[in-house]
């Protein structure tokens, strides 16, 4: 039997619209609006690479089977283009008519290369000759010959060139290397003034073609299909196979071509032919391409008045100053709510393990890491110090494959045992196991979390960490690593719930249990916080629970395929999405369970790919303080009346506002203030504790 289901791709576009809505808000600081606009553009880049690329492959294969929402690939592509046109128009209208004038008034000026003063023109020429021109490689476009390879997601300047003697017309492309900054400064001491690098290249393009006249230029940008999977069944060498995937992406089909709105027809034709771009994948934009490249503008020094007030991460009150992490975790479980509480204890956990002579072994899963990673450095140091270091490096982490290959090679050279993931599955679990010798016995310490071991994104994403030395968790962690490194099965776990073997059945049982309690007239309640909700089985179970009368509150940041407001299926289901300063990334689940709640954190969203095709972990929380805290966190999202939006029956959303007489409540601000208050209270408690000096 079919169930009400919102299309996944259209739901994602609604999420991106919610992000764009933040950029449209006149009450946000100006540079925060620029940041949100850049995020929407970056999101769209990945959406086209992965989701649109996949749909275009399905269309080409002739597949006409509808998805659970009833839409075929062709219908999805048609609807995506229609909505994309509106979103792009909104993006560029905001950028050109609102943000640019406001930035100029504030002293941050985007200067048209056609309107440079003599002093500015000299600066641009100097920058071109010294820092740009030596890195450029013009590519000729010759009729009848194989067209040059156009790099994906790079700015390319197309040129129409006339021979100065014969007048013969030809065309060429000038790719702008990724390593070059987007902005070329022409500041004169009064604020910040800059020219876009593509305009600098276009202005000086004639210098690259001596003896010829550059009659016209236009910037364009290509997005290629990034949904290219490794053929693991035939891959004896996974690392080598991943290198082939990376190479294949450079040659994959064009899924989007971005062109200026005002573009000479002959240049447009040449560009489309060179790129092999379908007409339905071509988008004309009224402004600079690659708005994602304006992210760094949001961090322009000296304009703090145009940014949000800083919310510094706070120390955990459960970790005493001067304590080792092992001392703190040895006393009781430590729950951390990032970034309100610092990620530092997680990094220290691994760094201390690397240097502690009592530590025997470290085992860890790495999915995405920072470019300059203290965690990688610590693991290398641990291996060099003679500890048994085992690292599962997931090579199939999309768009991080190249970095992960390099990381794995560095670790292997240091002496670490490296495993390249699990065949046929992505390993997405967040787990680190440290074995330490204490009083002649081995004791296991475990970090389990919802987010990556990435100190850069840990400042921008909200996540939950648990540090524990409970024996059952340590035993389960050992079983987990034995399974993923030794080709055994994920069985006999006492506490941890792994996917793809046990997590989905356990979730379905938990939901069904709440439904049965509701049918018996008992209180029944579910709270869940996920990034995405797409799995049809989970959605069907939630519908059944709603029919039984279970009160269901879902905080879904992004994709939500569950249809709200359906009197038959979802009468008792409320879904909100919170878009704020930090990217909501934590997964937290609460089941009332007859008054003895079951509370979990997890690495997995409620999506088919996570529950059926990835190695994930769901972690029960047993510490009473941590359980109460997680419930308060969940409840706070449903009190938010400033940054939360209600998901409507058609998949769109409506921003929530305080009711008459109701105070404003912003969940993320509340979490920051709570973390600061807890840290101050702990400092005060320490200050009031007298510790006498004792004779030796």
Q: What do the PLM-derived regions correspond to, one by one?
A:
Residues 531:
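Cofactor-pocket helix-loop regions in the catalytic cores of large enzyme subunits
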Residues 1-526, 535, 544-548, 560-582, ...:
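N-terminal localization/anchoring segments of enzymes in phospholipid and broader phosphate metabolism
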Residues 538:
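Polyanion-binding catalytic cores of nucleic-acid enzymes and NTP/SAM-utilizing transferases
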Residues 551-555:
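Hydrophobic alpha/beta core scaffold segments
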């Amino acid at each position: 039997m079919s169930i009400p289901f919102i299309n996944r791709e259209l739901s994602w576009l609604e999420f991106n619209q919610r992000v764009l809505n933040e950029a449209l808000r006149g009450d946000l600081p100006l540079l925060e609006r620029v940041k949100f606009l850049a995020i929407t553009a970056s999101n769209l880049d990945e959406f086209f690479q992965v989701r649109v690329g996949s749909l275009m492959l399905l269309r080409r294969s002739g597949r006409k089977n509808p998805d659970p929402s009833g839409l075929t690939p062709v219908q999805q592509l048609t609807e995506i283009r229609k909505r994309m046109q509106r979103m792009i128009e909104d993006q560029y209208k905001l950028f050109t008519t609102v943000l640019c004038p406001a930035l100029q008034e504030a002293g941050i000026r985007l200067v048209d290369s056609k309107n440079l003063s003599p002093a500015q023109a000299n600066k641009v020429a100097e920058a071109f000759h010294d820092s740009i021109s030596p890195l450029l490689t013009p590519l000729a476009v010759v009729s009848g010959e194989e067209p040059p390879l156009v790099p994906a997601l790079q700015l390319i300047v197309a040129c129409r060139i006339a021979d100065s003697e014969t007048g013969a017309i030809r065309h060429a492309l000038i790719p702008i290397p990724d390593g070059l900054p987007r902005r070329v400064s022409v500041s004169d001491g009064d604020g910040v003034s800059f020219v876009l690098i593509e305009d600098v290249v276009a202005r000086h393009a004639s210098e690259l073609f001596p003896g010829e006249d550059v009659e016209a230029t236009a910037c364009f940008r290509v997005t290629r299909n990034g949904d290219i999977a490794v053929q693991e069944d035939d891959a004896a060498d996974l690392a080598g196979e991943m290198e082939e995937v990376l190479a294949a992406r450079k040659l994959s089909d064009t899924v989007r071509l971005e062109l200026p709105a005002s573009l000479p027809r002959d240049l447009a034709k040449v560009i489309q032919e060179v790129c092999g771009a379908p007409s339905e994948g071509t988008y004309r934009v009224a402004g600079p391409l690659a708005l994602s490249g304006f992210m760094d503008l949001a961090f322009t020094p000296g304009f703090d008045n145009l940014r949000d007030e800083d919310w510094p991460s706070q120390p955990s009150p459960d970790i005493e100053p001067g304590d080792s992490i092992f001392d703190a975790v040895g006393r009781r479980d430590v729950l951390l709510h990032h970034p309100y509480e610092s990620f530092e204890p997680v990094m220290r956990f691994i760094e201390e393990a690397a240097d502690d002579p009592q530590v025997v072994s470290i085992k860890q899963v790495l999915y995405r890491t920072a470019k300059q990673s203290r965690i990688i450095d610590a693991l290398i140091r641990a291996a060099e110090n003679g500890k048994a270091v085992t690292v599962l490096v997931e090579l199939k982490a999309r768009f991080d494959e190249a970095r992960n290959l390099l990381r794995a090679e560095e670790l292997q050279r240091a002496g670490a045992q490296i495993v390249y993931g699990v065949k046929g599955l992505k390993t997405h679990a967040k787990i680190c196991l440290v074995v330490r010798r204490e009083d002649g016995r081995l004791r296991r310490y475990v970090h389990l979390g919802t987010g990556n071991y990435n100190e850069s994104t840990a400042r921008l994403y909200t996540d939950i960490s648990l540090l524990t030395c409970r024996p059952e968790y340590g035993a389960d962690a050992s079983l987990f690593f034995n399974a993923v490194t030794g080709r055994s099965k994920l069985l006999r776990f006492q506490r941890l719930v792994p996917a793809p073997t046990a997590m989905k059945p356990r979730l379905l049982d938990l939901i069904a249990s709440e439904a049965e309690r509701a049918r018996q007239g008992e209180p029944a309640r579910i709270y869940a916080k996920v990034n995405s909700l797409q799995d049809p089985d989970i959605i069907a179970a939630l519908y059944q629970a709603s029919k039984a009368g279970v009160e269901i509150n879902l905080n879904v940041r992004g994709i939500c395929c569950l249809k709200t407001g359906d009197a038959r299926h979802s009468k008792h289901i409320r879904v909100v999405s919170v878009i704020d300063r930090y990217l909501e990334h934590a997964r937290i689940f609460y089941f009332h369970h007859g008054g003895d709640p079951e509370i979990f954190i997890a690495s997995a969203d409620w999506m088919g790919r996570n529950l059926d095709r990835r190695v994930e972990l769901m972690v029960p929380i047993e510490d009473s303080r941590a359980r109460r805290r997680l419930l308060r966190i969940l409840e706070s999202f449903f009190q938010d009346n400033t940054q939360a939006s209600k998901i409507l029956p058609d998949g769109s959303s409506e921003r929530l506002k305080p009711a008459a007489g109701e105070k404003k409540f912003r969940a993320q601000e509340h979490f920051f203030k709570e973390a600061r208050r807890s840290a101050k209270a702990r400092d005060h408690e320490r200050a009031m504790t007298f510790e006498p000096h004792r004779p030796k």
